[in-house]
Amino acid sequence: MAYVINDSCISCGACEPECPVNAITAGDDKYVIDAATCIDCGACAGVCPVDAPQPE
């Protein structure tokens, strides 16, 4: 399983530096998690102020 960032993302960028495998990048409207790279650690979810990263 991987995490996905839902539409509540405010593009604050808090999640990107927390990802230990660099699976998070800035998208057009929100940040995006590469499911093939994500290791399901939940680090992104732990720092997100709006709980946008959710388990897929």
Swiss-Prot record:
Co-factor note (free text): Binds 2 [4Fe-4S] clusters.
Coiled-coil ranges from the UniProt annotation: none
Pfam families, alphabetized: Fer4_7
This protein's UniProt keywords: 4Fe-4S, Electron transport, Iron, Iron-sulfur, Metal-binding, Repeat, Transport
Domain 4Fe-4S ferredoxin-type as annotated: residue spans: 2-29, 29-56
Iron-sulfur recorded as keyword: yes
GO cellular component, one term: cytoplasm
Domain of life of the native organism: Bacteria
Entries under Gene3D superfamilies matching the protein: 3.30.70.20
Positions contributing to [4Fe-4S] cluster 1 binding: C9, C12, C15, C48
Cited function: Ferredoxins are iron-sulfur proteins that transfer electrons in a wide variety of metabolic reactions.
PANTHER family: PHOTOSYSTEM I IRON-SULFUR CENTER, PHOTOSYSTEM I IRON-SULFUR CENTER-RELATED
This protein's name: Ferredoxin
Annotated organism of origin: Acetoanaerobium sticklandii (strain ATCC 12662 / DSM 519 / JCM 1433 / CCUG 9281 / NCIMB 10654 / HF)
